[in-house]
């Protein structure tokens, strides 16, 4: 199977409980509530203030909103940072759950969340906790998911404030300790969510740094343990009506030392795409195995951020201190020859030598091309990283670059003693 081929899931009929009709689980529109895209990604971290500053300084984002002691949140602090439609929320506990006074006036809900957050940090370190989808019908998506076996974390509820209106949200469990929030903000006019205060002042030093032209979240990748990929994909198909958009196996994603399998699940209207990876047998430990070991289980491996100008983006990030993986020059020697000899209906718009200098990779078919690059892991645990991606009439996921990318990652694994 071609790595860029769009593949279909087995066709399963489900009952639309609003109409009583049998509907195909791969239908793109029909009765399924629409997914509008990624709303935001929530990270649970040890120090939200420092994490927010890190992404502002290195990735060119800015603090947009805040929730903490000053807004009445007595046990948690959260910072919303973002650029255009990229939104990350960093949340930290600000009290110990084991040293609270016996007469502490804390709700049972906050006590349980405080305990869960500390346990999550001990198990995973700084990590993605939640990937939020904006949908047009929270109740409909939630009910269908739960009816199909999804674990409910929080049923639909409405949050509001007098000034900005209300949002509706619900939470379901996905792979590992990761969750999905389902959010509708049609009736909300504020910057983010009720309970957050807008932040309008930014450190003066940020204005001296090169701007980073990010646009939105392109996709979020989940790593699974051995033989767990298909169960994770089945969850998205069964519970959220996603379909299999794209897939490759270990015959196509392998190096001399390791291999993996990958399936991309997409929402019914294809606006949300969630690649799911698992390790495959190889001579040594794959990057997926390394992730699962240091993350203590399945979780979000990387978040791809879309840009319309990857050269400017990567150069700006590099000047700000972001570390990217290094690609051998032999890759570009081969790519230069291919671009000169292979038939296609497009011309590369970027300066090839600048792509080489910035270690940016190229994948393409006859109709278009993709440019991409991975950062090094963002934490001391070799777990989460960021991908920068630019699409030019190309909907694939860089299968042509997988071998080169993974060989580059393996070189760093070897330095860490984890290959």
From Swiss-Prot:
The residues covered by the VOC domain are 37-185, 216-376
Q: Which Pfam families match?
A: Glyoxalase (PF00903)
The record's CDD domains line, in alphabetical order, gives: HPPD_C_like (cd07250), HPPD_N_like (cd08342)
- The residues listed in the UniProt record as binding Fe cation, with positions renumbered to this chain, are 219, 302, 387
From the UniProt record, list the reaction(s) this protein catalyses.
Answer: 3-(4-hydroxyphenyl)pyruvate + O2 = homogentisate + CO2
State its cofactor. Answer: Fe cation
The UniProt entry, under PANTHER family, shows:
4-HYDROXYPHENYLPYRUVATE DIOXYGENASE (PTHR11959:SF1)
> Mind telling me what this protein is named?
4-hydroxyphenylpyruvate dioxygenase
Native species: Pyricularia oryzae (strain 70-15 / ATCC MYA-4617 / FGSC 8958)
Q: What is the lineage of its organism?
A: Eukaryota, Fungi, Dikarya, Ascomycota, Pezizomycotina
UniProt gene name: HPD4
């Amino acid at each position: 199977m071609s790595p860029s081929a769009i593949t279909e899931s087995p066709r399963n009929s489900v009952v639309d409980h609003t109409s009583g009709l049998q509907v195909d689980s791969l239908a793109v529109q029909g009765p399924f509530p629409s997914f509008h895209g990624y709303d935001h990604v929530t990270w649970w971290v040890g120090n939200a203030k420092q994490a927010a500053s890190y992404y502002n300084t290195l990735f060119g984002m800015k603090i947009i909103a805040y929730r903490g002691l000053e807004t009445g949140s007595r046990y948690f602090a959260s910072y919303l940072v973002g650029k255009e439609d990229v939104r990350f929320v960093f949340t930290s506990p600000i009290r110990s759950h084991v040293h609270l006074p016996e007469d502490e006036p804390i709700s049972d809900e906050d006590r349980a969340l405080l305990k869960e957050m500390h346990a999550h940090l001990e198990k995973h370190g700084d990590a993605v906790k939640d990937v939020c989808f904006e949908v047009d019908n929270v109740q409909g998506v939630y009910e269908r998911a739960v009816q199909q076996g999804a674990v409910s974390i929080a049923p639909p509820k409405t949050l509001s404030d007098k000034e900005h209106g209300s949002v509706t949200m619900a939470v379901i469990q996905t792979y590992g300790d990761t969750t999905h929030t389902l959010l509708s903000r049609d009736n909300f006019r504020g910057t983010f969510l009720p309970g957050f205060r807008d932040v309008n002042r930014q450190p003066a030093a940020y204005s001296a740094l090169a701007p980073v032209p990010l646009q939105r979240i392109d996709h979020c990748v989940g790593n699974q343990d051995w033989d767990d990929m298909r169960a994770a994909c089945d969850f998205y198909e069964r519970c959220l009506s996603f379909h299999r958009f794209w897939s490759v196996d270990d015959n196509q994603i392998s190096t001399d030392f390791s291999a993996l399998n990958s399936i991309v699940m997409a929402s019914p209207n294809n606006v949300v795409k969630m690649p799911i990876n698992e390790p495959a047998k190889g001579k040594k430990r794959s990057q997926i195995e390394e992730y699962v070991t240091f993350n203590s289980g399945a979780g979000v491996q990387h978040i791809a951020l879309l840009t319309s100008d990857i050269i400017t983006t990567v150069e700006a990030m590099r000047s700000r201190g972001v570390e990217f993986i290094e690609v051998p020059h032999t890759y570009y020697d081969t790519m230069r020859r291919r671009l000169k000899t292979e038939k296609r209906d497009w011309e590369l718009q970027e300066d090839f030598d600048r792509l080489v200098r910035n270690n940016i990779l190229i994948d393409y078919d006859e109709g278009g091309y993709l440019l991409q690059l991975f950062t090094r892991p963002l934490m001391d645990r070799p777990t989460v990283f960021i991908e920068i991606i630019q699409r030019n009439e190309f909907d694939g996921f860089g299968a042509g670059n997988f071998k080169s990318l993974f060989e580059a990652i393996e070189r760093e694994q070897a330095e860490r003693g984890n290959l």
